[in-house]
């Protein structure tokens, strides 16, 4: 009877004389999905609490972070979470892979590398700077003791620039490698929690290198500027000009005025003059080209100088007696009086007469001819190395019959620019 009463109470049916204990609230059934009341706090957390935990991640200590990371890796739902992240990445990662393109090498960086390599600053060999300096010194044509000292100073300073460049480049490479290694380790560590492919790690390394390349370009740019300043100070063609020695100038002027009818020395004569003056053949050619131009433009200015060298040469030959007939066709030694073969006994004096408008007294000319002797002009005409030229009043040399052995430019009577070819 009691059992039947309990069933009817559960169904909400009252029995007369037996009130329902507990009131109406006792008739409300419990939901099927709700856990029992004795199971403790609910398992789900509020979204606000989750966001608050995310915001406080940066304030955690390393020990707390390692503990949470270990708890996440050991969680039974971690593989499922990782697979969901992989699916999301697979859907969104296609557009990222399609946009990946290899960027070409920066042309400015390539030019800087080529310049540093050409100057001997870059390259595997530590002695490249000295080799480049020696090549530059040879190209400049300087072989005198002063130039050798100057080029030694240039090599020392270039070596200093090279050492500074390699030291700074080593620091740059070390910093770049350290940062790249740190990022790679960080990405590998994160790949345990979120999906990161090896290609993505390589892409990130490329981005880091491009960021660091601006530092490398600045280093190479400053090094190239330092090398260019050094070259302009020591080896550039526009640097301060250095005149020849007084002895070399005397030898060149004496040769020029003694061959005034044909001031175009052959290659053999240039080599001999270069040895006597301690300069190069190229410098001899440049000097004669410039001298011819200046002489044509300022004949009156060089009149006195030409007269002095004419008398000096004649006196030197007169003192030598008739031995001038056997003299060589090129200058003798650097310490001698500088006797040269004239193009003819009359050429030099007649040239002065036609150019300057001032004639020598006949007695002076005859005395000089008598002093030099009758066999002098004959021997000279037999051993002429240059073809005679007619010197016009405007300063141009008109070429006569040019032998095949003479190397002189073909020019007109008033040509000036063609002289520089020799």
Curated annotation (Swiss-Prot):
Residues 401-410 have a biased composition (Polar residues). Gene3D superfamilies: Homeodomain-like. GO terms for cellular component: nucleus; transcription regulator complex. Residues 42-236 form the PBC domain. Belongs to the TALE/PBX homeobox family. Residues 237-299 bind DNA. CDD domains: homeodomain. InterPro entries: HD, Homeobox_CS, Homeodomain-like_sf, KN_HD, PBX_PBC_dom, TALE_homeobox. One of its GO terms (molecular function) is DNA binding. The keyword rRNA-binding does not apply. This is Pre-B-cell leukemia transcription factor 2. Transcriptional activator that binds the sequence 5'-ATCAATCAA-3'. It comes from the Eukaryota. Residues 1-43, 319-341, 353-422 are annotated as: Disordered. The keyword Nucleus applies. Keywords: Activator, DNA-binding, Homeobox, Nucleus, Transcription, Transcription regulation. Residues 49-128 are annotated as: PBC-A.
